[in-house]
């Protein structure tokens, strides 16, 4: 009996169709992911340029010689009893840098924007959190170094450096809708979540609280390299606490999500309380009026301050713009990373509702609480995608 030629051709035909379809799907995924990543370049580059203008262009345009009692940090340092010119390390270069930073924060904390600055420092942790979290993941990128990036944003301003940092995170994070090796898509294990919590408590919260309570220049100087303390405490925890056996449930990706989300809830609560205290301070201030609230005159000015602006007001202006640029960068970056973590594409209408909802949360509960909500949603999305991938591979 002679086999039917059509039956012989069927496997080949099916193989060809399956191959074409699979290649089409792969190419489509690559194009979509490349489009998502390419779109981030003009967005975060624009934020970087705007931050340079509103922060450094404004500050550099001020004539410090006309300001009363300008803080000075001579090179080499001349150690005196002045808070900024104390002997912090005994080394010329670090002491000169610390002189500038301590003077800056000492003047700013005694400026009219003191409440705004404290509010910003409480919200800041949620802004820089992905620099800690995304590197910690099993398949996280080693290029995302909070130690290095944190040093840069402490010296040059978080609002200037973070747009480039978020751009790096986005480009070093793959979409779960992609194929092949996926960077930055593994949910956190229990040990990783514990290390993040330790770095937050010992590297940021403890020095921040002591600095805010004492306002001691030595503590202000010690607080400046908090990205170092966060990186070092996390590394020490991971080195000293042994990894659980691979068969242990706590070693599986996603096992640390509950602890991580509990940490986020705590951070969002602290951020919300600080935000409400700040709003109370704003609404009860003698200068507050409803027209100024509705006309957004409470936002820092885009125009360059007058050349005879006192240092206290100039530093306050700098930190206000620093906060605005940090919040805008982190908000857009969080939405981008959330989209990369989702297995399904969100519609335009869905994004509009989500953005408006998150802005409402940010206004009511504070930027830190809003960002913690987004980081929690991203972790949930990664856990869902990881479980779906595991079921598919069974």
Positions of the model-derived regions?
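Long, hydrophobic alpha-helical transmembrane bundles and adjoining juxtamembrane helices/loops
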Residues: 2-394
């Amino acid at each position: 009996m002679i086999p039917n030629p059509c039956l012989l051709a069927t496997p080949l035909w099916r193989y060809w169709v399956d191959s074409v379809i699979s290649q089409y799907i792969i190419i489509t995924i690559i194009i979509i992911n490349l489009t998502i990543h390419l779109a981030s370049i003009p967005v975060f580059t624009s934020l970087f340029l705007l931050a340079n203008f509103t922060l450094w262009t404004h500050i550099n345009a001020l004539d410090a010689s006309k300001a009363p009692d300008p803080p000075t940090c001579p090179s080499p340092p001349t150690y005196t009893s002045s808070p900024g010119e104390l002997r912090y390390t005994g080394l010329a270069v670090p002491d000169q840098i610390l002189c500038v930073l301590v003077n800056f924060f000492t003047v700013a904390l005694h400026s009219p924007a003191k409440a705004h600055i404290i509010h910003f420092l409480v919200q800041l942790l949620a802004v820089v959190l992905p620099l800690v979290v995304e590197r910690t993941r099993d398949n996280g990128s080693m290029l995302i170094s909070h130690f290095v990036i944190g040093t840069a944003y402490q010296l040059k301003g978080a609002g200037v450096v973070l747009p480039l940092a978020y751009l790096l995170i986005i480009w070093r994070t793959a979409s779960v809708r992609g194929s092949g090796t996926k960077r930055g898509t593994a949910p956190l294990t229990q040990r990783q979540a514990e290390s993040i919590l330790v770095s937050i408590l010992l590297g940021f919260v403890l020095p921040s609280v002591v600095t805010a309570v004492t306002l001691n220049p030595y503590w202000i100087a010690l607080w400046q390299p908090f990205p170092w303390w966060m990186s070092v405490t996390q590394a020490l925890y991971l080195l000293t606490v042994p990894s659980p056996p691979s068969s242990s449930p706590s070693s599986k990706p996603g096992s640390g999500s509950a602890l991580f989300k509990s940490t986020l809830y705590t951070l969002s609560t602290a951020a919300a309380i600080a935000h409400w205290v700040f709003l109370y301070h704003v609404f009860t201030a003698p200068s507050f009026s409803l027209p100024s609230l509705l006309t957004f005159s409470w936002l820092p000015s885009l125009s360059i301050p007058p050349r005879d602006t006192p240092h206290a007001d100039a530093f306050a202006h700098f930190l206000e713009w620093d906060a605005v640029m940090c919040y805008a960068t982190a908000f857009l970056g969080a939405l981008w990373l959330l989209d990369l973590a989702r297995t399904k594409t969100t519609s335009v209408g869905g994004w509009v509702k989500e953005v408006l909802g998150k802005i409402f949360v940010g206004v009511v509960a504070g930027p830190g609480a809003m960002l913690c909500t987004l980081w929690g949603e991203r972790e949930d999305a990664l856990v869902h995608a990881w479980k779906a991938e595991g079921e598919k591979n069974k």
